[in-house]
């Protein structure tokens, strides 16, 4: 995991403090859309590395597989049964691209038939997980209101009016969730099973080389982010992913009182877990606020935190490439590279089978950044005039389908992109992310002392 960043200020000034647009929790209509993009009805990305010809299975073979599938169809509602059939025919159900090689079917069976965390419902969890796998574009960051009958008890937890979250800061976590569902369905189902179980946690073995070239530097990162782990050798570590204690409260609300366009219980558990990882185990799901040593803002994740989280969730060496130059007054003053290089790097990553999570900014009439938001680029196409259109998933646009942005609109707004190491190293020198994190930590401590 690396970061390419020549200016510490631009690293600190970008943050998902606010979403670019949000639908109020009482509103069940899609947020108003600007004509900068158009809807795209596609359901799947053309290429997915998890489904190669060598491991694509679309037929139940063993008696165990048949028994599990039959049990699920007995439990499931009509829509879930339909989606299960789609997952089987497309190879998703029997995919075993998970950390422990369990299949999507194995984990869905556990979700449906074994005890869940208190207040969670097996049938609802099965429905939500299957729907997300069949249609990953349903992943959203819209919180939903606290049901009136639970407001007094929720406020008594010490969170007051902060529990009415209208503008979610979970776009980085929601983007990572979408990526996991679309690119690694068996692992998504494994996370859904573990996070909704009585233990409310998932263990995952990762390669330390996907965090840093040097083992000690990788261990520094794990310690800095305070994620529980066990390392018995210099090559791998077993990490424990878990949401904060209040995630179960929100997940219960979304189980019994979920409105249209709001997060599912699975969305809550996934996003709370990934926010907790990125915020150094300091996230509070009830208020959508965090603490942590790398960010002085209580909302969202900064670039460094998002890249760490993405790297450990996918167990891939991600490089955070920063494109925009931001001065100390949060003003956009230029770019680190030209748009042609930016476009080439994104397309190269897509051609490798990766989605690309980007952070983009909005500026006011003085070119000062006022908003930051994370979305996922899942594809691209070029017209006869050579102009490219990017196909994206936005977890905060009030739609359950892809959207399209022209290159002229999107490229100037991209602050950073999470790219595979092989892509970024072709065109630039990279700085390891643990170095970036240490420098930022020292800078924040210095700023705090000056204020104090």
Q: Where are the predicted features?
A:
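Short linear sequence motifs
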Residues: 2-7, 30, 40, 44, ...
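Intrinsic-disorder/low-complexity regions
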Residues: 4-7, 11-14, 26, 39, ...
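Active-site signature of cysteine proteases
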Residues: 5-30, 42-44, 299, 305-452
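Active-site nucleophile-adjacent alpha helix/oxyanion-hole segment immediately C-terminal to the catalytic cysteine
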Residues: 65-97, 101-298, 357, 399
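Low-complexity, intrinsically disordered export/secretion signals at extreme N-termini
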Residues: 1-110, 126
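Serine/threonine-rich low-complexity intrinsically disordered regions
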Residues: 5, 21-24, 36, 40, ...
């Amino acid at each position: 995991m690396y970061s390419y960043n020549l200016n510490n200020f631009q690293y600190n000034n970008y943050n998902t403090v606010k979403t670019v647009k949000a639908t109020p929790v009482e509103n069940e209509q899609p947020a108003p859309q600007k004509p900068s993009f158009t809807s795209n009805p596609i359901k799947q990305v053309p290429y997915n590395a998890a489904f190669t010809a060598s491991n694509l299975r679309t037929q139940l073979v063993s008696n165990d597989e048949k028994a599990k599938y039959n049990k699920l169809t007995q439990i499931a509602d009509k829509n879930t049964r339909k989606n299960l059939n789609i997952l089987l025919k497309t190879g998703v159900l029997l995919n075993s691209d998970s950390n422990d090689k369990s299949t999507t079917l194995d984990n869905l069976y556990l979700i449906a038939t074994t005890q869940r965390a208190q207040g969670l419902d097996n049938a609802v969890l099965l429905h939500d997980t299957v729907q997300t796998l069949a249609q990953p574009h349903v992943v959203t960051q819209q919180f939903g209101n606290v049901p009136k009958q639970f407001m007094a008890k929720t406020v008594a937890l010490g969170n007051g009016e902060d529990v009415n979250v209208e503008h979610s800061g979970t776009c980085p976590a929601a983007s990572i969730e979408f990526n996991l569902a679309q690119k690694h369905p068996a692992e998504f189902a494994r996370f859904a099973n573990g996070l909704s179980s009585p233990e409310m946690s998932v263990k995952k073995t990762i390669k330390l080389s996907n965090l840093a070239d040097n083992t000690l530097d990788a261990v520094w990162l794990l310690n800095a982010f305070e994620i529980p782990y066990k390392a018995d050798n210099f090559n791998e570590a077993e990490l424990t992913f878990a949401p904060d204690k209040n995630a179960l409260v929100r997940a219960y609300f979304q189980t019994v009182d979920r409105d249209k366009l709001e997060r599912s219980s699975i969305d809550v558990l996934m996003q709370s877990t990934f926010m907790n990882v990125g915020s150094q185990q300091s996230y509070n799901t009830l208020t959508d606020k965090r603490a942590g040593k790398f960010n002085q803002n209580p909302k969202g994740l900064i670039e460094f935190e998002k890249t760490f989280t993405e790297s450990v969730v996918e167990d891939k060496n991600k490089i955070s490439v920063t494109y925009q130059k931001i001065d100390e007054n949060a003003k956009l003053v230029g770019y680190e590279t030209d748009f042609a290089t930016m476009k080439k790097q994104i397309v190269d990553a897509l051609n490798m089978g990766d989605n690309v999570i980007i952070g983009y900014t909005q500026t006011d009439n003085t070119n000062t950044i006022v908003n930051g938001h994370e979305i996922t680029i899942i594809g691209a196409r070029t017209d006869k005039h050579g102009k490219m259109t990017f196909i994206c998933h936005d977890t905060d646009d009030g739609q359950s389908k892809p959207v399209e942005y022209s290159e002229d609109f999107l490229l100037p707004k991209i602050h950073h992109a999470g790219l595979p190491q092989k892509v970024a190293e072709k065109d630039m020198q990279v700085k390891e992310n643990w170095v970036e994190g240490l420098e930022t930590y020292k800078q924040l401590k210095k700023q705090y002392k000056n204020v104090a």
